Amino acid sequence: MAALQEKKSCSQRMAEFRHYCWNPDTGQMLGRTPARWVWISLYYAGFYVVMTGLFALCIYVLMQTIDPYTPDYQDQLKSPGVTLRPDVYGERGLKISYNVSENSSWAGLTHTLHSFLAGYTPASQQDSINCTSEKYFFQESFAAPNHTKFSCKFTADMLQNCSGLADPSFGFEEGKPCFIIKMNRIVKFLPSNNTAPRVDCTFQDDPQKPRKDTEPLQVEYYPPNGTFSLHYFPYYGKKAQPHYSNPLVAAKLLNVPKNMQVSIVCKILADHVTFNNPHDPYEGKVEFKLTIQK
């Protein structure tokens, strides 16, 4: 018992460790002979080569089943979301306020519009084509250069008085501001049967404070009638249409009451667009609050 309980010295432990690392009597290194180390190394090398090959084969088969022209992620919404420019968000959604007599209060809003429309200049649309059919532009083949599909031009001048070309202030200076409305893209989405979807902007009453004897909102739409031409649909995806630009509709609000906050809703009217989803306030429509001080 005394021998078993005897503690080994540091030199004894180091000697045993060196003997384990290399045993000159048996020719073993770390408990195995060099030949066995070679065989076990070859076994693991072969094992991981086979596993890597199987993994690569699985990835290859998976990639062959994926359509490169279909987005990796798609929303579950059947109707496109709608966005507004300029977009200034308050605590509860879009809230825009400015003073007609103070240029600094609306300079940032017009800068947002100019920056947004920079992608709709003729130079930026030079790879797109002119479309005038007013019908759905179906493309079964990839006839455009680099195995892509054609995209229709949409330039800022199509927004006429709301293009920022003739009036750089977009009507904000005179209290008749322009707002640009855009539908989000959905691959192969057809908004209606045979009629172009259009924008309809109206005052939205507060259920708790209904307004009385108020005239309807007067709006000038650009392009005329506030329509999104059908030849911009369907959209085939970013890879198939790398030069695609969303069509736009500008709404110039003509009779917004001054010095008070009003709620405005702009809806997309089309056969296949819904705007009554209580879970998504931006599906098929956009709501915002506007205050014009004078």
Swiss-Prot record:
Residues 1-36 are cytoplasmic. PROSITE patterns: ATPASE_NA_K_BETA_1, ATPASE_NA_K_BETA_2. It is found in: Apical cell membrane; Cell membrane. The chain crosses the membrane at residues 37-57. One of its GO terms (cellular component) is sodium:potassium-exchanging ATPase complex. Residues 194-294 are annotated as: immunoglobulin-like. Glycans are attached at N99, N103, N130, N146, N161, N193, N225. N-glycosylation is necessary for assembly and functional expression of the pump at the plasma membrane. Disulfide bonds join C131-C152, C162-C178, C201-C266. It is a single-pass type II membrane protein. Residues 58-294 are extracellular. Pfam families: Na_K-ATPase (PF00287). GO terms for biological process: cell adhesion; pH reduction; potassium ion transmembrane transport; protein glycosylation; regulation of proton transport; response to lipopolysaccharide; sodium ion transport. Expressed in parietal cells (at protein level). The beta subunit of the gastric H(+)/K(+) ATPase pump which transports H(+) ions in exchange for K(+) ions across the apical membrane of parietal cells. Plays a structural and regulatory role in the assembly and membrane targeting of a functionally active pump. Within a transport cycle, the transfer of a H(+) ion across the membrane is coupled to ATP hydrolysis and is associated with a transient phosphorylation of the alpha subunit that shifts the pump conformation from inward-facing (E1) to outward-facing state (E2). The ATPase pump is composed of two subunits: alpha (catalytic) and beta (regulatory). Interacts with alpha subunit ATP12A; this interaction is required for the formation of a functionally active pump and targeting at the plasma membrane. Interacts (via N-terminus) with alpha subunit ATP4A (via the P-domain). The C-terminal lobe folds into an immunoglobulin-like domain and mediates cell adhesion properties. Belongs to the X(+)/potassium ATPases subunit beta family. PANTHER family: POTASSIUM-TRANSPORTING ATPASE SUBUNIT BETA, SODIUM/POTASSIUM-DEPENDENT ATPASE BETA SUBUNIT. This is Potassium-transporting ATPase subunit beta. The lineage of its organism: Eukaryota, Metazoa, Chordata, Craniata, Vertebrata.
